[in-house]
Amino acid sequence: MTQHTLTRRGLLIGSAALLAGLPQLSLAQSGGPSIHVLKDPNCGCCSAWIEILEGDGFTVTTEASMGTMLMRYKSDNGIPQEMVSCHTGQVEGYMIEGHVPAADIRRLLAERPNAVGLAVPGMPYGSPGMGPESEREAYDVFLILHDGSTEVYTNYEAA
């Protein structure tokens, strides 16, 4: 019968292997970036946008909010009035206002600019959750800077 003893070296190698695998385990369990969304509970387009994000691997939690409470949340978190849309999300310290495509959110998280976040003001037809992309009208995704100014982050031409 063979007797196995645990050496310090074996313990260190095993521990290192376990720790190396933890980030992958964590990502597999979470399903991707987590975004918390404040929205009017009666808004169908907000729900459609959330379904698109979930289909793209985001983990989404929601909170019902409307009227002055929602507008105050937007303002308190650096969303300029001219950038406002129907729902507001927060992901990894960034604000996401309106029907921002998942690809732009992923790009934001990869690039990590010094900014408040992204916005698609209004509700442009054909943006995620707002009708078929094949019929979309032209719209811009804006990067909101900390001084309240904005710059075009991505331009989507009409289909």
Regions found by a protein language model. Give the residues of each.
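Conserved helix-turn-beta segment immediately C-terminal to the redox Cys motif
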Residues: 52-61
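Thiol-based oxidoreductase modules, predominantly thioredoxin-like and allied folds used
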Residues: 60-71, 91
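Local sequence-structure signature of Cys/Sec-based thiol-disulfide redox active-site neighborhoods
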Residues: 33-48
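N-terminal secretory signal peptides and thylakoid transit peptides that target proteins
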Residues: 1-19
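Thiol/selenol-based redox catalytic cores and closely related redox-interacting motifs
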Residues: 75-159
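Boundary at the C-terminal end of the N-terminal hydrophobic targeting segment
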Residues: 26-28
